[in-house]
Amino acid sequence: MSEDLFVSINFPNGKSVKQPIGLYINGEWHKSAETWETVDPSIEEVIAKVYLAGEKEIDYAVKSAKEAFKTWKKVPGSEKGELLMKLAELTEKHADTLAAIEAMDSGKPLVSNARGDVDGTIALLRYCAGWADKIYGQVIPTGPEKLAYAKRTPIGVCGQIVPWNYPLNMAGWKIAPALAAGNCIIIKSAETTPLSLLYFATLVEEAGFPKGVVNIISGLGTVAGSYMAKHPGIDKIAFTGSTKVGVIVQQLAASNLKAVTLECGGKSPFLVFEDADLDQAVKWAALGIMYNSGQICTSNSRIYVQDSVYDKFIELFKKHVIQDYIVGMPFDDNTVVGPVVNKTQYNRIKNYIEQGKKEGAKLVLGDEPLPLKQGYFISPTIFADCSENMTIVKEEIFGPVVAISKFKTEDEAIEKANNTTYGLAAMCFTKDLERAHRVSDELEAGMVFINSTENSDIQAPFGGIKMSGIGNELGSNGIEMYTQIKAVHINFNNKL
């Protein structure tokens, strides 16, 4: 193992790590002709340079995965489950290191955010390990002269593209079900946040996965991501990211009609009815837009409050955000809101804030100067009295910025909630059980949260409709997305 494929990284908490920077292909670490600087968004300094995969490296990864698939697909589900369980144990053993890498590379607060992401990855690995020997088909009754059955088989070589907002967690959502179902994978991190997934590759190796089954690469979306999406040797592509890029991925994937799973953008509405528990609505609403600095696809970035409790909600919401959502450095134990991921996102979010003010939204909180002299920090920002034609209401901002509006009737709330091209998630706060079911039926979203938000479960499907995506991750549905149906017909006595 070449030492120049690893670098030493020192964390602000005094600890350090031997960080891989190469391409993990066919069970070995490789260099390439191109490198990329990954930057700590809290201090705007380079952490490390990682090697980038180009077409040549991806071709090699596909070749390796195809060869490995010949034997991996035949490995009993129980053995696949054991390997995934071993990987979960190793991830748990290295959880503090992985969380520190995420905090430095993405700006996530270590205590309030990054460690929880790693714990979620561990839980999902164990969940999918349990599924590996329980992927059943069905026997179909056809009469005494024939037997027909359908079996779920692995798809083959799966390309997976991970976003920068949850580098390891979203990787786990793709890696675990794909392997449990018997596929081989080539997974690409976001170029902005490659480090935790590269470190995870060392755990894959230690767990004992056969060469070629798991290939982990860094690469530019415009180069490696595009090439993976259109590669004729890749049988499925799974992508999490913006809707704009998701559309491109689907177009490229059509070149060989590969299976596609897309988890894209959102502009989730959060409805607060007058009978709601306002204290709870305030706390959940804040969590749903300020956590992870608002960089969550399901963020409830639109809040609609019934007119009779509108002013009270805004008063409580502002007070709660000021008290509980402290902006600070990722390794500070008190920090809840860290920096956004890079300068591009920082400028983009700032432009949206200016647009909100320009279009007449009332700035209730935010846009104040922060004591931090460097880093891509944005203070929690609350706009009120927003109208449906405002840019901050229509477009995904992907930052700690929320637009609040009022409604009079249930029908008006539903109409406003559905007035978007997105359909990932929606939230409804009410004590009226009948209303909860009635409204959830009418909301155009792949997921509806009643009296909560951002508390999806690994056992339940996660996915959107409309321009928010295709297919699901998590739950049994997430496993099935990595399988295909094969129907087998057995003739007993039917002779010609």
UniProtKB/Swiss-Prot annotation:
Keywords: Cytoplasm, NAD, Nucleus, Oxidoreductase. The active site is at E263, C297. Belongs to the aldehyde dehydrogenase family. It is found in: Cytoplasm; Nucleus. Gene3D superfamilies: Aldehyde Dehydrogenase, Chain A, domain 1, Aldehyde Dehydrogenase, Chain A, domain 2. One of its GO terms (biological process) is beta-alanine biosynthetic process. Its main location: cytoplasm. It is an enzyme of class 1 (oxidoreductase). One of its GO terms (cellular component) is nucleus. NAD(+) binds at G241, S242, T243, K244, V245, G246. GO terms for molecular function: aldehyde dehydrogenase (NAD+) activity. The record marks N165 as: Transition state stabilizer. It comes from Schizosaccharomyces pombe (strain 972 / ATCC 24843) (Fission yeast). Signal peptide: none annotated. Its EC number is 1.2.1.-. This is Putative aldehyde dehydrogenase-like protein C922.07c. It holds the Pfam family Aldedh. CDD domains: ALDH_ALD2-YMR170C (cd07144). InterPro entries: Ald_DH/histidinol_DH, Ald_DH_C, Ald_DH_CS_GLU, Ald_DH_N, Aldehyde_DH_dom.
